[in-house]
């Protein structure tokens, strides 16, 4: 008996030790820095769209485009334990173990609009392969692809969302027959009348009556199942509204607002409640970032689609770009936060710069005039500008900022003489760099988010950004890493003195970079400062300008008609008379004392308040709300877009909106539907995939990037953390599942951990994200409708396109 007691004590001690090890290691930040690929699981023949660990951590479930489910035995080297041929005829988007079923029951949802329940105990044949004999239930209520399944913790009920705009609740114990209409008792939320597709649904584990949904609408919605009128069958009619089915109690949006354009081009790819902290909700937007919300946040915004001013809102920490609450996709918090906490507030403007006067020059004339600010030859104004006369300097700054604003927001594109898009982007970047360099020459100049160099534009811009940040006191000397110069740049680069073109300052990029790196950070004399600003950076500007085909502006300018004057800045007097200051402008400048010298323009009363989003260097301006109204009132009648916008504005109009408390950036979420997840013993980390084939892990509290791991050849869409062990399962476009932990040390040069190269990765992703934010999206509903209208038949009554086969993940 004593031997048995000793064995029991040993078992208890072993269990206690294992639990302690799990608590100490699981989600440890030190472990995260050493994470790498352990194993790659092969068995699927299509993209793996869904992963789910069993509650005990013994099995991993995966579902794929090949319509099969595989259950992997975790503690038997991840060998396949069960292979299920589901009978689905389209991609499997979601698959989950049913709680309390001893890992024997599995739910699956597919693009064929079906939800199926499989019971492995019902298989009559032994072995690993299973077929339709294991299917015990099938629900066919949805009118479109079923995207997500969330099992309830009771083991009987589960929630689903579909691209038909509905969220539904089922009970596996109850029989259910449906004729695929909207008169169905399973419906909790019905957004079908608003033409909204739902992509994600999540339920709070601690408060299971709360669930959140998101899709092709800029808001995420929180619902309370306790307010569902399930007892009154008469309430379920064809005209059932979301308010009658289930009550929405909160909406979520970054900064608590969205603009009109966002109603159509922004959508949510994933929502996820925290298991450890029921008040926390993660939401991921396409072409945007991951945001953390507090469900019961006291501070909420009045729901509106107009511009929201919150002058009392204080930023969480000082930064260079302390702006208006961030209006989506225009400039990045990555750039904002990397400007550091030490930035003088006097150099900061809260709003993007906005011109206060009409355009007086063609764009080619603007180029010629701005060139004069940095040259001394051929009537150059450089010496006059830097001579110390504030009126010269402030007006030159205003002129460049106006040029940026006009080119960003000019939307007239002639059919025959269209301005090359790459030239437009190059010009905007160059003029932004001009503003940054001018800001170094005078301490009273403020920077706006649309007038600053951003990382990722190229190695020379990165170098100028590095120098500018350092000289402005924005970051320490080594705070910014650079992308390496290209081979062409190494061969052709020669930087000459802008005042003495025959004098070579640097003959290759490496020489210039090393020279700046050797600067004594504690002793930057005025002579050195003058050299790097007025010689090196000014020379870089002229070098960049020489590579831009400015002549392409001329034929485009000739077809424009909004220029009020064609006067050039031929001399200093012409320059001063052309830029006539507004009333009290000189007094404003002279009394600025370091404040924004153009603040009077950013709040000009004539500006369109609905134009919340300034367009950066790669975008064209969109129609404002006023434009939408005028379209609706035109002789041609309302447009499809205006009608859709009106419908989506009407979704839950009186529900309070919560703003985010944290944002996580660095990844790119444009090309596919990606999930987002918590990780750690107390959900202290945030994880998301990226279009570059990597996945990111952030510290939840300070939003810093802890790890960047390569997980797929194209894009990582799914990341799931093991419930007990420090292990991650990752999948994406590849047909394999990757298992990541720290058990294996990869050979030198073979590591998938790319955290050390974070700067270049983040900069590249930011550029791709901004480009993707301007690409129009198209849903499967839209694609099917277009296909139906365009290809009903081939003219002889023969169908040439199966619209039901059109599906987008």
Swiss-Prot record:
GO terms for biological process: negative regulation of fatty acid biosynthetic process. Pfam families: WD40. The keyword Repeat applies. It is found in: Cytoplasm. Residues 608-636 have a biased composition (Acidic residues). GO terms for cellular component: Cul4-RING E3 ubiquitin ligase complex; cytoplasm; cytosol; nucleus. Keywords: Cytoplasm, Repeat, WD repeat. Interacts with ddb1. This is WD repeat protein iqw1. The lineage of its organism: Eukaryota, Fungi, Dikarya, Ascomycota, Taphrinomycotina. The gene is iqw1.
